[in-house]
């Protein structure tokens, strides 16, 4: 079992949750929706989102709407590939 091939950036529990949600649908995710699904504090979530964004795995966009501006997040092509590669390594480790 070679765990060294798992992407350490994605393997962290909170970031794995973020990547899983972002990969689960084609639409972008609003920060507040991610926060609600993941049950994370604003500060904790934004720290992990920035880490993934700095790695090029996701991108964000601030939009003005009714009320407060919202930040939307989605996987980049590199992020989607990294997540798919992560899942492939995990399946190999699990013998699937």
Protein language model annotation of sequence segments:
Residues 19, 55, 63, 85, ...:
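Amphipathic, soluble alpha-helical interaction motifs
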Residues 2, 6-44, 65, 72:
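N-terminal helix-turn-helix DNA-binding core of bacterial DNA-binding proteins
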Residues 1-3, 81-96:
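Amphipathic alpha-helical dimerization/coiled-coil segments
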Residues 65-84:
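Basic, amphipathic "hinge/linker" alpha-helix immediately C-terminal to the N-terminal HTH DNA-binding motif
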Residues 49-50:
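Short, hydrophobic-biased segments on the C-terminal half of alpha helices
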Residues 31, 57, 73, 83-86:
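Aromatic side chains
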Residues 53-69:
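Beta-hairpin "wing" of winged helix-turn-helix
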